[in-house]
A protein has these predicted regions:
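Conserved beta/loop motifs at nucleotide-recognition and modification sites
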Residues: 1-162
């Protein structure tokens, strides 16, 4: 579920793929699952924001390139990145006010698993830094929609600026 998201149909398909991959093998390990399972777009974006947070910009750029090869549009990717940072911001504020993960999920109407992932990430950010990133997202969105520059390049420059 961590790799595929919470869509039951996708989870079911991925389990079927694992069973076919295993054949007669009685056990499976984490490495097998990571190699076989396709990460959801949402999981890729969480991974992307994790790379950014850790300063692993090369990995972040490579993931952007991979997603674009898979026909994901830079504007869509930025929208998802922005959504993640807004979620981080909301989680940071509400957790400071003493809300639990479940309360946060209910308050902002987000799946509890997304909130759990976000709460693990927000520990590494100050509120002002999150606001700065959200502002940079808005500026990049404007550039993507109004500039004649290559959209992938604009997105990569955004990642490098964080």
């Amino acid at each position: 579920i961590e790799l595929t998201g919470i869509n039951f149909n996708i989870v079911s398909q991925e389990i079927e793929k694992i069973i076919l991959f295993l054949g007669e093998r009685p056990t499976i390990n984490k490495k097998d699952v990571e190699e076989i399972i396709n990460r959801s777009l949402e999981q890729n974006v969480f991974l992307l924001t994790e790379y950014i947070q850790k300063g692993e910009k090369y990995k972040a750029i490579q993931l952007i390139k991979d997603l674009i090869v898979m026909k994901e549009e830079p504007i869509k990717l930025l929208a998802l990145i922005t959504s993640n940072y807004r979620l981080y911001y909301q989680c940071k504020i509400l957790s400071r006010k003493g809300y639990s993960g479940q309360q946060i999920a209910k308050t902002i109407n987000v799946h509890p698993y997304r909130v759990k992932l976000a709460l693990n990430q927000v520990k590494h950010y100050q509120l002002t830094h999150l606001l700065n990133i959200i502002d940079q997202c808005a500026e990049t969105d404007y550039k993507l929609k109004s500039s004649y520059m290559d959209k992938q390049l604009i997105l990569e420059l955004f990642i490098l600026s964080l």
